[in-house]
Amino acid sequence: MMRFKRTVSRRALSAKIAGAFWAVMFAGMTSYGTGLFDVAAKDNDVVTLRVCNWEEYIDEGDWDDDETIELPEGDIIGVNPMYKDFEQWYYDTYHQKVKVEYSCFGTNEELYNMLSLGNEYDVVCPSEYMIMKLMAEDQLVPFSDTFFDESVDENYYIKGVSPFIRNAFETNEINGETWSKYAAGYMWGVTGIVYNPQEVSKEDASTWNILTDKRYFRRVTIKDNVRDAYFAAVGAIKGDLLTSDDFINDPDYHQNLATEMNDLSPENLEEALDYLQKSRDNVYSFETDSGKADMMSGKVVAGYQWSGDAVYTLDQAEEDDFYLNFAVPKESTNLYFDGWVMLKKGIQDDAKKQQAAEAFINFVSRPDNAVRNMYYIGYTSVISGGDDNTVFDYLDYNYGVDDESEDVDVMEYPLGYFFSGDADDPDYVLITDSEQAERQLGAQYPSDDVMNRSAVMRYFDTEENAAVNRMWIEVRCYNIKNVPAYIWVVVVVAVIAAIAVLIRGKIVERSMKRK
């Protein structure tokens, strides 16, 4: 095994690519599988597949030769954008022309607005709460039975998705229907705190209360969106309950944790408002993307981050010999997913289009392609690989060390929960530097202990969304209720004085005209 052959993700090296459309055509024809996909073999029509994904969220290719990832299963290198490689693979595999129109969005809300304004896509990749919303609104096409057939060689998703992720998708429901019926995972992660260990202790970084900790006045950042901010607030205000032995040892702990972290009662909203207003007065900034740069520049010593962005931040800082850590709050962490779904308005009962859409999802889920995407963007794929060890070998390629290394404090880092579904599986124990438990490895693949205290934040219905947004407006706008009385007196006096000066000026002006 090699020590930290990890390099900075390609995302850190590439220019921002947003809203671009790419397409390549190849000749051919096919039929796929059985059942739903008995497509006419002699149909020469080109299938146009419209895919909309997050910005910088798929391998765009153009790797240098020295970026080649050398694994036991073979070398991996990205030459072309993955969606172009899919077109060629689809033709080679199914002998059918397909043209991919690839475009991007910046936020879930932007995607939803695009759909509401009439933009039509076949496959999109929203986050879990937007998937839930689209399911509730009956906007999605369910996967075919063929998609779940593990005997089909090309069904890389169902054969390779992590047992941990698969369980989450099969046990969470909207209106009595599981996520897995409509969504296939793509990337996943947790939320936590990136911090400078020279300035902040691990203990301080391991609680959501750091956002209001006066010792870090104007030296910590918080996410500038209501969902992430509200989750942190709930974790902080319910901290004593969530970390109590009685709560943790309850047989229904996970269900209770999800209930508490999704508490949208008026009382909880009021407490969250108070906490977030205190946070606003303490943090350096509310941010969406600038927090990474602020951490790397030293403007702040801690920042609320998604684990994928945490890996990017740690990578970039390390390039300058500046070492940061990642901690997951003890109260709870938000388990998030981005996943592929098919839209009714795009697919429109077109069997050939659905065939291509499901094949695209399978293609990006092939273990070597999962590695390409992880390397390029820095986030963690939901793919563990099943019987294919490519993903675990890539993990070892990045973080593995020789267990006899004398210059490294070596530890065993068990990852069976993700790769096989058995937390104690000896086949999936990584030998690594102990520091990595609190650095990139711990962010990319959190420990089983961390995942045990994770919770999925569900989507807000119309009424809940209105209530949460009202609360958020009070957080982000200046709260006049907190203005001291003496300030109001000064304001009133100033207004009266200004009016008096104005009136006096008018009187003088009139008297001058009379003269």
Go through each PLM region and give its residues.
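Gram-positive cell-envelope targeting signals
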Residues: 1-41, 477-515
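Early extracytoplasmic/lumenal segment of secretory-pathway proteins
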Residues: 37-133, 137
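Extracytoplasmic ligand-binding site segments that recognize negatively charged/polar headgroups
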Residues: 50-66, 74-79, 129-282, 286-296
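Short helices/loops that flank or line small-molecule/ion binding pockets
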Residues: 84, 109-121, 136-137, 210, ...
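Short beta-strand and adjacent tight-turn residues that come in two discontinuous sequence segments
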Residues: 105, 125-126, 222, 286-287, ...
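Extracytoplasmic/periplasmic substrate-binding proteins
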Residues: 281-349
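Mature extracytoplasmic/periplasmic domains
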Residues: 342-445, 484
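Conserved C-terminal helix/tail region of periplasmic/extracytoplasmic solute-binding proteins
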Residues: 419-515
